[in-house]
Amino acid sequence: MNKEVEILVIGAGPAGLSAAIEAAKYGAEVLVVDENNKPGGQLFKQIHKFFGSRRHKAGVRGVDLGGRRIIKKEKLGVEVMLNTVAYGFYPNGEGVALAVNGEEGLIVHPKKIIMATGAGENPLAFPGWTLPGVVGAGAIQTMINVHRVSVGKRVLMIGSGNVGLIVTYQLLQAGIDVAGIVEAAPQLGGYGVHAGKVRRAGVPLYVGHTVIEAVPNEDMSGVKGAIIAEVDNKFQPIPGTEQFVECDVIGIAVGLTPDIALPSMADVTLINAGRLGSQVPMHDRNMETTKEGIYVAGDSSGVEEASSAIEEGKLAGIAAAEALGKIDAETAKEAKDNVWSSLDQLRTGPFGAGRHDAKE
């Protein structure tokens, strides 16, 4: 089965929904596909409030922001196909292959493509890391915030970036005991506003430490604890500093890597940008890649905050609509300048400045 559309947006997270809404505002025909059973992406896991300025949704919870964007896309007539995987890209003009509900295939022939496929959690290999009970922080967040399922009784979190800190606090909100946070660096890695919450809650902080081993329970059905140790200035474990921490869940929060599978299939040029999570598609200020008509936005173009993903989605949506002749150059420039003003504000400070430089 074949389908023609003006703009295909792959991914219905913060970036993808924003791109779709922005393009549809100018009259573009937009199809959004997502492998999940509802749109919103990571926003529906985020029960915490955004902070910063009102322009950047300060005081709004991610879950509420996701709901608002769904209402907007419905009003604009954006078509959304859920439970749908984009699994193939054919540069010879045959289109983008989609698996629809796992039962039938569909080839979409879009004039423009916006890839907003997000990022995946990084694994951390150590003895016992494949045991039940060693869980990614994102999976923990999904269980407690989306499905309302307790992940365990006592959690040890490995990694103190924003994800590790936020999920730790959300575990406490869910009534789950936290055994501590383990961080190899000499200080916590995330924003002070998140670090302050876990400090005030009395969570033990093992900075300058690493996990050595997950200790299995008697029948190997899970974990009963972890062995951690101090590290030297080369991040190597210091013999004799090992200690046992009792827990039945070990959360892994050691960063994210952009999902570049589809850009790779499309033969988009990739560049190494460690501050953005590894290889990312090269793109210009319109979020257009080295392949004309293919745009990227959000974490798939470099890992940042959800607020940045929203703004990048807007840029891609405006640019795609302009390329289709839905918006004149002057109006498009004004709209993009407003978005860039917002993005530049987000990419300031000790964390944002590094991402700003990497994007440049």
PLM features: residue spans?
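Residues forming the flavin
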Residues: 1-360
